[in-house]
Amino acid sequence: MTNHDLASLSQTIETAFEDREAVSTSTRGAIRDAVEAALNLLDSGKVRVAERGADGTWTVNQWLKKAVLLSFRLNPMELVKGGPGESVWWDKVASKFDGWSVNEFEKAGFRAVPNCVVRRSAYIAPNAILMPSFVNLGAYVGEGTMVDTWATVGSCAQIGKNVHLSGGVGIGGVLEPMQAGPTIIEDNCFIGARSEVVEGCIVREGSVLGMGVFIGKSTKIVDRATGEVTYGEVPPYSVVVAGSMPSGSTMANGQPAPNLYCAVIVKRVDEKTRSKTGINELLRD
């Protein structure tokens, strides 16, 4: 699809979204065709909700988020096959694997272990491995990435190459508010078991999050070496663990208020060290 075609497609979707109250399951023609085309492009990985520039800046293609939102208005509730014992679900979004045969799976080149759930319009790159996990619509999972058991990749989340999302990890989805960016895990990151990264936060390339690290937009990210406090983004090649810091407040009884949770950057490593050092060794203090 040419840039001109994409521009035309995005304009149709932008216009439809402005008058979205008029869009329904009975809508036909250009709007439905445009939304279907956008979902197919997302599903095939030919377009992404967010793209990384050469300078590291992520640009969000808001029109693709709007296409996903419009699809909820266009599609009726229907039976979705694939439940245990031939049971069914009731939803507006089909499985990515609906109608797939051996040929489609071989062409896609990733592993989909029984009981993983991937909704249509999510892209899974070759050599990725999906354990019993959940990947929501509009998400992107990069080449060679492992999505471990009970991990969740939220709507429109962007997961890079050679990432390991450990068991029970939650990567938050962001469809609304419209201006919000998606949650992003860049290439070669390791996210420890039961950790959560949400609300459009970014974990930059090569970073390691220990088990049980929770990062949202309001979470303090403290560099232990410098004392610097930042929000919303983990710098490249950071090793991060869960911690706490003084709240700076005093309770009514005169005692110091409890410490508050934070994420602590315990060290930073270069690319060479990161590639040669085991995860457990990096996390040892």
Curated annotation (Swiss-Prot):
It catalyses: (S)-2,3,4,5-tetrahydrodipicolinate + succinyl-CoA + H2O = (S)-2-succinylamino-6-oxoheptanedioate + CoA. It is found in: Cytoplasm. GO terms for molecular function: 2,3,4,5-tetrahydropyridine-2,6-dicarboxylate N-succinyltransferase activity. Keywords: Acyltransferase, Amino-acid biosynthesis, Cytoplasm, Diaminopimelate biosynthesis, Lysine biosynthesis, Repeat, Transferase. It holds the Pfam family Hexapep_2. It comes from the Bacteria. Substrate binds at residues 111, 148. Its EC number is 2.3.1.117. Its main location: cytoplasm. One of its GO terms (biological process) is lysine biosynthetic process via diaminopimelate. Pathway: Amino-acid biosynthesis; L-lysine biosynthesis via DAP pathway; LL-2,6-diaminopimelate from (S)-tetrahydrodipicolinate (succinylase route): step 1/3. GO terms for cellular component: cytoplasm. HAMAP family: DapD. PANTHER family: 2,3,4,5-TETRAHYDROPYRIDINE-2,6-DICARBOXYLATE N-ACETYLTRANSFERASE, ACETYLTRANSFERASE. Homotrimer. Belongs to the transferase hexapeptide repeat family. This is 2,3,4,5-tetrahydropyridine-2,6-dicarboxylate N-succinyltransferase. It comes from Sinorhizobium fredii (strain NBRC 101917 / NGR234). The lineage of its organism: Bacteria, Pseudomonadati, Pseudomonadota, Alphaproteobacteria, Hyphomicrobiales.
